Amino acid sequence: MLRSTGFFRAIDCPYWSGAPGGPCRRPYCHFRHRGARGSGAPGDGGEAPPAAGLGYDPYNPELPKPPAQRENGTLGLGEEPRPDVLELELVNQAIEAVRSEVELEQRRYRELLETTREHRSAEAPALAPRGPNASPTVGPDEDAFPLAFDYSPGSHGLLSPDAGYQPTPLAAPAEPGSKYSLASLDRGQGRGGGGGGALEYVPKAVSQPRRHSRPVPSGKYVVDNSRPPTDLEYDPLSNYSARHLSRASSRDERAAKRPRGSRGSEPYTPAPKKLCDPFGSCDARFSDSEDEAATVPGNEPTTASTPKARADPEIKATGQPPSKEGLEAEGGGLRETKETAVQCDVGDLQPPPAKPASPAQVQSSQDGGCPKEGKPKKKKTGAPPAPSCKDGAQGKDKTKDKGRGRPVEKPRADKKGPQASSPRRKAERPEGTKKKPSSATPVATSGKGRPDRPARRPSPTSGDSRPAAGRGPPRPLQLPDRKSTKAPSGKLVERKARSLDEGASQDAPKLKKRALSHADLFGDESEDEAAGPGVPSVWPSALPSLSSDSDSDSDSSLGFPEAQGPPKRLKASPPPSPAPSSSSSSSSSTSSAGADVDYSALEKEVDFDSDPMEECLRIFNESTSVKTEDRGRLARQPPKEEKSEEKGLSGLTTLFPGQKRRISHLSKQGQEVEPPRRGPAVPPARPPTAQEVCYLRAQQAQRASASLLQAPARLAEKSPSVHISAPGEKRRIAHIPNPRLAAAPTGAKRTLAASGSQSSNGPEPGGQQLKTRTLSGMASKTTTTIIPKRIAHSPSLQSLKKPIIPKEFGGKVPTVIRQRYLNLFIEECLKFCTSNQEAIEKALNEEKVAYDRSPSKNIYLNVAVNTLKKLRGLAPSAVPGLSKTSGRRVVSHEVVLGGRLAAKTSFSLSRPSSPRVEDLKGAALYSRLREYLLTQDQLKENGYPFPHPERPGGAIIFTAEEKRPKDSSCRTCCRCGTEYLVSSSGRCIRDEECYYHWGRLRRNRVAGGWETQYMCCSAAAGSVGCQVAKQHVQDGRKERLEGFVKTFEKELSGDTHPGIYALDCEMSYTTYGLELTRVTVVDTDVHVVYDTFVKPDNEIVDYNTRFSGVTEADLADTSVTLRDVQAVLLSMFSADTILIGHSLESDLLALKVIHSTVVDTSVLFPHRLGLPYKRSLRNLMADYLRQIIQDNVDGHSSSEDAGACMHLVIWKVREDAKTKR
């Protein structure tokens, strides 16, 4: 966004010379574009190219030098559009009738641009006499419309045709000379065929006269003139001027400002813009002709000598400003009429004195303006002074030189001077805004009309006005003034907008109209600033004069600090609003070519022509209630209608709305003269920062590009090298990715398009190309980088919003830890949940459960980790079995490819001989379990029965203690340890209750040693039992080792295996000890294959239900005996069948079966103290499988115990398989 220094403005763009429109579409191009305006107006050749280049560069406010040519026609427009935007909206309806006339004037204006200044000067005198009546109606309306069109920031810019109604003429009427100049100019333009020129010129002339017009008796015209000239002058630059003028006028005459708002609505009609486009080309010619005309003797001396001289010759030669019809009839005449109107406005400022164009008069009038210029010069010490009194005396040649050479300097001066002297300019703006235009006008118009304005402005801001007139650079200073009033950034923006407007005006009136001034975009700022000092009414008229003078003598641009700032837009503005730009350009051409006389006459005629002006004044007065800020916005709205009419150009125009913002800055320049009100207005309008402005511009560019993509712009995009718009359009395609931005503001697109279409006749070709270039360039700058960023960031937009755990004081677990695990839970849940919301809810529930279960941080961490593992297990894995077994033992190609260690783990294709852990069943499991079979020694150590070597059916236990009872009838109770006597049948001889502890003894560490307690009641060892039985009981299994059977070997078929079974038995106490009462066998799938109650051979003394779970009812109907069970088991098992159980020796003793192929879980999971200690099955299941068994008060279940043993053994095998890979 840095401002260009303008070092390359004098060099033709290498990418521009190829075609008339030039392929260069870069809004930031630092080179001169000769063909840009040429397309709009062939006559712009010399000056137009620089102006085009300058206007083309929306970011180089220093480019106002080319505006010197257009400054005459466009500068005023730039200022006027600000107040006119509001007025145009209000006047839209009333001006629709004038739109056609404005269009014609615009076309004529472009034609006039094509014609030499000599031709303008010739036509100007003719236009001056006939302009008086027609000019007010046609001229003002047309001017207003061009300005509105130019001002396209709001409806104002789009209302270029309505600009004909412009309040700038009203501003001009404010001063007697200015008002008449505007009316005369308008009519002269309409009649003379220079309607566009008259319109354009009138805004400028009216802008300055308006400042001085306040003092002038013709107040109604002053208001009316100010408004129409503002609209007319706005084109691109005229809009700037209109803004400044408008603000100045609104400050000086809010009534006038209001009319401008009304007229903004009515003059807003896009039709005149179309005309403006045709005349935009004329305007381009006009710039060239201006330069050439500046050299032309007669007109040049008059214009250069003194604005008065120009105005007088016009008045004398024409007698009366050309009428409206004449204005419409002759485009060239209209332009001259506009210039004449500008000069007349100057003359009005200083009563339209004799047209003496002699350098003496110029100097004398400039002398009056010199003091004013002196101040601006001081302000703009760094900026090259525009031809002020001296320059005015020099003549049109200087105007050319200054217009071309100084436009470059002017931008610099504007930058430097405005920045350096921004404080002074702020103060001077209220005055300088009016005075500068008037001083600039005298310089440009040989001091005739301009000096008067400076004189009148001196009252409001005579010092400022004169310095502005006295220096060409002061015009840039005026931009700085506006800056100072608003902000340096605002000035820069204004300068950029002005330079863009100038380039745009040279390229095409449309382009400038597209360019929205800051005032249009931020109507509040620019209008308020301009209106604050009361300059609005004066500014519009003064700006028209300025633009005319600057075109003719470049003194106007230099003379008017504001004009200098606006000149950038001024030149840019003529193409945008052909009528205003043509009028301003033609007036400037005419003044430079010696149209001073015509201008004076036109000024008088414009002032005298009261019909259109009165109507405009009335409309403006009606809109007086509308705020200056609102006016800019209202003006924007009417342009939306035009936008709808010109959708094809809407995309191109969209960028220019940003430029119109700059135009609004030009308006600020006009307001620079009125810093007091600007200051307040600037903050309101300024609120948008540079970044915000850039963002808005980017949005507008995107919208424009979107519309262009749908239009022939796509074709242009296909051939970017050939067409300037093609590259821009392609960029717009790139912008399309943001459909919101591209499609959001349709109204703005329509407005821009409408303005472009209105100026399509003349400058539209070049202007549209320039617009397209600027739009595409801006779009590419703003959106090309934005699009990729958005695309890259779009994934982040889809990122899941994770819930945040609120902080709580005194929480058990720090919130940070809880939040971390919650995020982990969400990530895991997202892997298997169908929706994000479901995953979040599940994670929240899991985290809450973990938090509720955790009394401390450490426990929460453990629980959270376990929960996280559980959630990870729920997530589907590419290799289902891998997660279960970790694939450590078996490394297969498939497992490695699917595992996390695939890149680090080596694998062998020959190794997968062993099955995967998940497939451990049948023979595979059998082969693995063979590793866990008890050895002979282990069998002996654990008390397993072995066949007796001597007694068939007998068994032997190697761990049994041989106790020889002293008495065969004496027994020892296995529960309480009490000795009791039994009969031969085994019954107790005495009935004694048995007090016992059913729980085992457990040693606990206590202070000073160990303590042994019973697990059942925690009573100390040796204490009385907690349970009572009817009688004592004995085990007796190891004492009776008869009736044992041994499993035998069987032949196996094919692929079958001997089998794997888990076994568990329940026993009850009988008269002979423990005997089998229930047996259960399960397979590897934990399916019960055999389960039955067994009736003991002896009488049951105690069912031992607490442990066996067998009740009397269970055995009541049982007829199965031990022999039956043995027969079944021998048929099921073979010698190689693997039997699994916990302390299986007790079960085998109960079954009286001898079997050595066993897997004992008590041995597989040994007690840490070793034998004889063994861990209970219940504890093993709780520790390893996290399962609780034997928790039923009714006793154990043999099937449950058998299944538990099978689970434990399979788990053990799999765990070992993981570690033994």
Curated annotation (Swiss-Prot):
Residues 393-417, 492-501, 627-648 have a biased composition (Basic and acidic residues). One of its GO terms (cellular component) is nuclear body. Residues 86-115 form a coiled coil. The modification Omega-N-methylarginine is found at R191. Residues 1060-1209 form the Exonuclease domain. SUPFAM superfamilies: Ribonuclease H-like. Residues 37-46 have a biased composition (Gly residues). Residues 357-369, 580-593 have a biased composition (Low complexity). Keywords: Coiled coil, Exonuclease, Hydrolase, Methylation, Nuclease, Nucleus, Phosphoprotein. It is found in: Nucleus. Its EC number is 3.1.-.-. Its main location: nucleus. Residues 498-577 are annotated as: Interaction with ELOA. Seems to have no detectable effect on transcription elongation in vitro. Interacts with TCEA2 and ELOA. This is RNA exonuclease 1 homolog. The lineage of its organism: Eukaryota, Metazoa, Chordata, Craniata, Vertebrata.
